[in-house]
């Protein structure tokens, strides 16, 4: 492996440098790279995206009309032409390293040139509130299966199979882990620090979750209660179901936190309960933007007893009130800060319903 381009996703960052200021909570810098071989075409397609705290800030696509590193967040647009030139060259070197790796891997697995194959890398680091390294990580996959990963000590590798052991022996002989560790403890942490400072108005803000609960009959005897948390930032959140005060971890269906498409995140957790026993279950929501955890309990709606005309008129009034309420809630819940931990939003406001450019990375080849 050569110390040049940021190579495919196994590089992770790390570092032990202190920041000159303190940030709320931990922060992360992650890159996701994908190289896909295409039979009949000379070069595989290479795509790389970078995230700071789960917010995409950069992208590169080798199939673009003019392949270059492209900004995906306003705060990174302030970087000058030299930065983007270095980024573009970095991605091109990385793409070339992945092309070589794809060819090598095809040989390791005794595969023909007829099929399409995929090499993926994920690498990154987490920094603490003081800007020091909490952990570094990196892992790769070939055709959707684990291949090789850097261990937590940042000094050794774990191979998933005998083919990956070939790569492991190559990298151990070349002392790649040592080079990688030294690189990560320097430039990667510096880059993360700079991104957090430049994007602090966005990256260090807090938006508390909008929550509600839904009820879905499964049969005559059971129903699903689903606890929703929407429009929150940062992405870290905890949803917990309890029955009579006891956690229902084994019986909870929990989806991964996912982007909402507007810079915020959403998540839900569900539990199947016996019909008529819904009141025994509560959902507990914890998030940095909340002054204290929220507790939600299902409240069944009463049957309508007013005339249909009254219903229509009432809905019209409620629609107006809902718009006004949403504006007020948004004003109360949205907080942009440059450091303080914890939100300024109240439980009532937040609950909708109680129901550094890298001059080089390590372009290692498998």
Curated annotation (Swiss-Prot):
Glycosylation site positions: 110
InterPro entries given in the database record: Ig-like_dom, Ig-like_dom_sf, Ig-like_fold, Ig/MHC_CS, Ig_C1-set, MHC_class-I_related, MHC_I-like_Ag-recog, MHC_I-like_Ag-recog_sf
Region (Alpha-2): 115-206
Region (Connecting peptide): 299-308
Extracellular side: 25-308
Alphabetized GO MF terms: peptide antigen binding; signaling receptor binding
Gene3D superfamilies per record: Immunoglobulins (2.60.40.10), MHC class I-like antigen recognition-like (3.30.500.10)
Biological role: Involved in the presentation of foreign antigens to the immune system.
Subunit comment: Heterodimer of an alpha chain and a beta chain (beta-2-microglobulin).
UniProt-recorded name of the protein: Patr class I histocompatibility antigen, C alpha chain
Biological classification of the source: Eukaryota, Metazoa, Chordata, Craniata, Vertebrata
């Amino acid at each position: 492996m050569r110390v040049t381009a940021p190579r495919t996703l196994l590089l992770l960052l790390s570092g032990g440098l202190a920041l000159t200021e303190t940030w709320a909570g931990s922060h992360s810098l992650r890159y996701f790279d994908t190289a896909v071989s295409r039979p009949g075409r000379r070069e595989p397609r290479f795509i790389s995206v970078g995230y700071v705290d789960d917010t995409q800030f950069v992208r590169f696509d080798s199939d673009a009309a003019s392949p270059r590193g492209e900004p995906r967040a306003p705060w990174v647009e302030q970087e000058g032409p030299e930065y983007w030139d270095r980024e573009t060259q970095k991605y091109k070197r990385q793409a070339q390293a992945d092309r070589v790796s794809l060819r090598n891997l095809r040989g390791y697995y005794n595969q023909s040139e007829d099929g399409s194959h995929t090499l993926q890398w994920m690498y990154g680091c987490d920094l603490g509130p003081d800007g020091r390294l909490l952990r570094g990580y990196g892992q790769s996959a070939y055709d959707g299966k684990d291949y090789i990963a850097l261990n937590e000590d940042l000094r050794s590798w774990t191979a998933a199979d005998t083919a990956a052991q070939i790569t492991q022996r190559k990298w151990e002989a070349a002392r790649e882990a040592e080079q990688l560790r030294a690189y990560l403890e320097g430039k990667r942490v510096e880059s993360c620090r700079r991104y957090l400072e430049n994007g602090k108005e966005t990256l260090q803000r807090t938006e508390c979750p909008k929550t509600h609960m839904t009820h879905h009959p499964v049969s005559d005897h059971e129903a699903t209660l689903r606890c929703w948390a929407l429009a929150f930032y940062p992405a870290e959140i905890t949803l917990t179901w309890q029955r009579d005060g006891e956690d229902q971890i084994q019986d909870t269906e929990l989806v991964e936190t996912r982007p909402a498409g507007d810079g915020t995140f959403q998540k839900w957790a569900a539990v199947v309960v016996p019909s008529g026993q819904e009141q025994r279950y509560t959902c507990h929501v914890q998030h940095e933007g909340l002054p204290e955890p929220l507790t939600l309990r299902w409240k069944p709606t009463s049957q309508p007893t007013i005339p249909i005309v009254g219903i229509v008129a009432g809905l019209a009034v409620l629609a107006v009130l809902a718009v006004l309420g949403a504006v007020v809630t948004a004003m109360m819940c949205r907080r942009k800060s440059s450091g303080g931990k914890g939100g300024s939003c109240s439980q009532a406001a937040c609950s909708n319903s109680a129901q550094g450019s890298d001059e080089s990375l390590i372009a290692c080849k498998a």
